[in-house]
Amino acid sequence: MNEIKNQIITEKTIRLLQKNQYTFNVDSKLTKTKIKDWIERFFDVKVKSINSLRSPRKKSQKRLPQTSLNDKRMIITLKPEYSIPLFINE
């Protein structure tokens, strides 16, 4: 379960749950197709679509300029007859 880091719970994501959309932070190296296959196998659901976004890199305030990679956030829309449990226990 290293692919999905955590499930995001905010006001916006709770609104998206009504549209059958779930939001996860995932490993930044993964593609949409890999995430889709993994979600369908792990949760036994059918994915309708996936939207992905990355937040800007964080810059350090040290003497030498460095940047760190941020996670990729995926918004996964499921077909109407499927759902995912709200919290993932590790």
From Swiss-Prot:
It comes from the Eukaryota. GO terms for biological process: translation. Its main location: plastid. Pfam families: Ribosomal_L23. SUPFAM superfamilies: Ribosomal proteins S24e, L23 and L15e. Keywords: Chloroplast, Plastid, Ribonucleoprotein, Ribosomal protein, RNA-binding, rRNA-binding. It is found in: Plastid, Chloroplast. InterPro entries: Nucleotide-bd_a/b_plait_sf, Ribosomal_uL23-like, Ribosomal_uL23/eL15/eS24_sf, Ribosomal_uL23_CS. GO terms for molecular function: rRNA binding; structural constituent of ribosome. Disulfide bonds: none annotated. GO terms for cellular component: chloroplast; ribonucleoprotein complex; ribosome. The keyword Endoplasmic reticulum does not apply. Belongs to the universal ribosomal protein uL23 family. Binds to 23S rRNA. Part of the 50S ribosomal subunit. This is Large ribosomal subunit protein uL23c. It comes from Psilotum nudum.
